[in-house]
Amino acid sequence: MMLKEATGGKVTIITVGDAAVEPVMRKALAIGADAAVRINMNATDSFSTATEISNYLKENPADLIIAGKESLDYNGGAVPGMIAEMLDLPFVNACNGLEIVGNDAKVSREIDGGKENLSASLPLVIGGQKGLVEESDLRIPNMRGIMQARSKPLTIKEPSALSSETAAL
């Protein structure tokens, strides 16, 4: 949300899951996300999850796609890389620092023996790592945000035929 406040733009939360994930999505709306999209299927594997998110993003392009570390692939980080490949976008994984300057992103990540600083043009997919948001910057929704979140859109999309067939296998 700090990135949104610093550079403008819109934040949309996208997840693949059933109705049980909606309270977490509403919390993201309460702390400042503009919209949320839930793709209505149980995420059974990384490929079908990445396919669904990519299909949505093909119809609704984004300048910056930030994927969290916690995922159904036991934190393997496969989903953001697959999304980047499916959308033919650059990808940087394990990012713990991000700065947007114009149409470029400056990202940093810890590697064996030090820190790596990279630059990439937007649009871009990054996989987040601890440190991307400082603990002191974490937000707790206030009552006003919670009330506003009730009126913000939470769109429910049905999965594509391809992912439905893959999940059935």
PLM features per residue range, with description:
Residues M1-L169:
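N-terminal glycine-rich FAD/FM-binding segment characteristic of electron-transfer flavoproteins
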